[in-house]
A protein has these predicted regions:
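Conserved HGGG/HGGXW glycine-rich cap/lid loop of the alpha/beta-hydrolase fold
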Residues: 2-40
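Gly/Ala-rich beta-loop-alpha elbow adjacent to hydrolase catalytic centers
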Residues: 66-75
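Short alpha-helix in the alpha/beta-hydrolase fold that links the catalytic acid
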Residues: 156, 170-179
Length: 226
């Protein structure tokens, strides 16, 4: 099996930690970066500070950045780094329509209904570890941020992935996110909901490998002008 050309770095979703990607990492060598609100019960700084913390963990590169759910927002903000060779966004959740609590609750319940029940204890223990305070703070920091503006400045391949049963990342929103990236591509996984990193690890691993091969090994982009 071909491995990615370069290091894979994963950023988990809201309240989640490395356990959310354990099944994926059995199939794909990858490193997980935990951040406040995403596995760490720490005060959540501004989104650009979170992105800077992620960039400090990238090493020499090239790197394939993979974000899940709210982690997509941090990945999009960090992806202008010249060490990033490709980006995979699993279920980005900053659809402006979800700033309404009623819409968010309705979509969350609809998505939960489409998830396998075996995930519930695993997700609950991760949320407990991260804590509601950090999770709320991350949502407030990330949800107003314009991911389309971020991705417009990302020249590397960007693969947007959603499950066909994911109401937190509906089809029209995923299309909009994909269109914002100069080299964006949308992939929908049939029957999956929001937790594709956990429920469909084979599909996600294949997409990460494909994204990594779409950028030549060792490519370095020049640093951006200040």
């Amino acid at each position: 099996m071909n491995e990615p050309s370069g290091r894979v770095v994963l950023v988990p979703g809201l309240g989640l930690d490395a356990r959310s990607s354990a099944r994926l990492r059995e199939r794909l060598p990858a490193d997980v970066v935990l951040l406040p609100g995403m596995g760490l019960a720490q005060p959540v700084p501004a989104l650009d500070v979170l992105a800077a913390r992620l960039r400090s963990d990238l090493g020499d590169g090239p790197v394939v950045l993979v974000g899940h759910s709210q982690g997509c927002q941090v990945v999009a903000a960090a992806a202008v780094d010249p060490r990033v060779a490709a980006v995979v966004l699993l279920g980005p959740t900053t659809d402006p329509r979800m700033r309404s609590a009623a819409v968010l609750a309705r979509r969350w319940l609809g998505t939960v209904a489409g998830e396998p029940s075996w995930q519930a204890p695993l997700v609950a223990v991760q949320w407990w570890r991260t804590g509601p305070r950090a999770m709320r703070a991350l949502w407030r920091a990330a949800s107003p941020d314009r991911i389309d503006h971020r991705l417009a400045r990302v020249p590397v391949p960007v693969v947007v992935v959603r499950g066909t049963r994911d109401r937190l990342c509906p089809h029209d929103w995923a299309v909009q996110v994909c269109a914002a990236a100069p080299r964006g591509r949308l992939v929908e996984i049939p029957g999956a909901a929001h937790m594709t990193v956990q429920t469909h690890p084979d599909d996600v691993a294949a997409l990460v490998r494909e994204a990594s091969r779409s950028s030549p090994r060792g490519v370095r982009r020049p640093p951006e002008s200040p």
